[in-house]
Each structure stands twice: as structure tokens, then as C-alpha cells.
């Protein structure tokens, strides 16, 4: 997409449980939304942030997500239909925004779930740029292929570890005043 960063308006939609489980399975400490936001802000402005989950089950993350100004969409955990209602709600909200807010030209789907591939296709059909964010080992190849761009959380973790190591090398603390 040839849009300059000052003209990029992004809407973020986070399937929180999916990404939190992916981070856990990859043996990272815990999902850090700040890493994702720092990378995305290099691309443009973020005008909408929504995160979907049964927040009763993920209470420990609520304050961090609130601090990052996410609207937390409460999706009670009911497994009667077999279909994740967080996924459905996320799709409905993303399409609603696509059709009603023309200034939003970039959609970010934070999930590794292949169920979002039809959403990505529909957004692209409507001339929206789509960025996916997910954990490498728990992200569908189909989702990766459908997005215009995909950011692996694993790369963000490695980058922050490299930055921390460089900082530590410049300012060693072993016994020096």
C-alpha cells in the first residue's frame, strides 16, 4: 500500500484468547500488547482498539489492556454451539467499521485463527490493507497468506530481547557505581 504513515488510520481487532494461548504455548512470559502497539505505531495512527475475550478467565491482563486504551469486549465462555462467539463478534464489528468508517484504511487482526481468512478477504475486497499479528507456531498458513502483511509476535519478542541486551552491554551493572 502506497499510503504514507501520516495517512494510515488503523483499527485493531484482537482475538485475545487465541493470541494469549499461542504465547503460552510458545513459552513466552506473557502476551505484551505494548510490543505490538510499538511496531504498529511506526506505520501510522491507531484509531480503534478492540479486544475480545472472556475477561473473567483473563483477569490478569485486563489492566494492561485498559492502560493500552483497548475497548474490552466481554464474551462469556459458552461452548454449546462449538463456534467461538468472540470470533463472530470480532468479524461483525470489523465489517461494520469497514462499511461505516471510510477513513479507516488499515485493519489489524491480532490472531492466528484461520477462521478470520474470509474476513481478511472481504476487507481486502473493500480496498482495505490488512495486517495480521500472531505467534508463529499457532498461526494458520491460510491467514498469513491472506493478509497483505503479517507480523510475528515471536519477532517482536526477539527484537525487544536484542534491544535489552544492547542496553545491558552499554550499561553493565555488575558491581559498578
Placement of each model-derived feature along the sequence:
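Domain-level signal for Mg2+-assisted phosphodiester chemistry and nucleotide/NA-binding surfaces
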Residues: 1-99, 119-124, 129
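Short, glycine/polar-rich helix-capping loops at beta-to-alpha or helix-loop-helix junctions
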Residues: 58-62, 135-143
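Short, well-ordered beta-strand core segments
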Residues: 72, 107, 130, 150-151
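Short, acidic/turn-prone active-site loops that include or flank metal/cofactor-
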Residues: 76-81, 134-138, 155-159
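Short, surface-exposed amphipathic charged segments that create phosphate/polyanion-binding patches used
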Residues: 86-93, 145-146, 164-170
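Active-site histidine-anchored catalytic micro-motif
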Residues: 100, 105-111, 115-134
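N-terminal regulatory modules in eukaryotic regulatory proteins
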Residues: 133, 163-177
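Contiguous mid-protein beta-loop-alpha structural module that forms a pocket-lining wall or clamp
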Residues: 139-164
Amino acid at each position: 500500500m502506497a499510503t504514507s504513515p501520516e495517512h494510515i488510520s488503523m483499527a485493531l481487532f484482537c482475538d485475545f484468547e487465541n493470541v494469549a494461548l499461542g504465547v503460552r504455548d510458545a513459552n513466552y512470559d506473557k502476551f505484551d500488547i505494548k510490543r505490538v502497539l510499538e511496531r504498529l505505531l511506526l506505520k501510522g495512527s491507531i484509531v480503534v482498539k478492540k479486544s475480545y475475550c472472556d475477561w473473567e478467565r483473563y483477569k490478569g491482563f485486563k489492566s494492561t489492556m485498559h492502560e493500552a486504551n483497548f475497548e474490552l469486549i466481554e464474551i462469556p465462555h459458552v461452548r454449546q454451539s462449538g463456534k467461538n462467539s468472540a470470533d463472530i463478534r470480532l468479524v461483525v464489528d470489523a465489517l461494520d467499521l469497514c462499511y461505516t468508517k471510510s477513513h479507516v484504511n488499515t485493519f489489524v487482526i491480532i490472531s492466528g485463527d484461520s477462521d478470520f481468512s474470509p474476513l481478511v478477504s472481504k476487507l481486502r475486497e473493500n480496498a482495505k490493507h490488512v495486517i495480521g499479528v500472531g505467534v508463529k507456531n499457532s498461526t494458520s498458513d491460510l491467514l498469513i497468506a491472506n493478509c497483505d502483511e503479517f507480523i510475528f509476535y515471536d519477532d517482536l519478542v526477539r527484537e525487544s530481547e536484542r534491544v535489552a541486551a544492547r542496553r545491558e552491554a552499554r550499561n553493565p551493572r555488575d558491581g559498578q557505581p
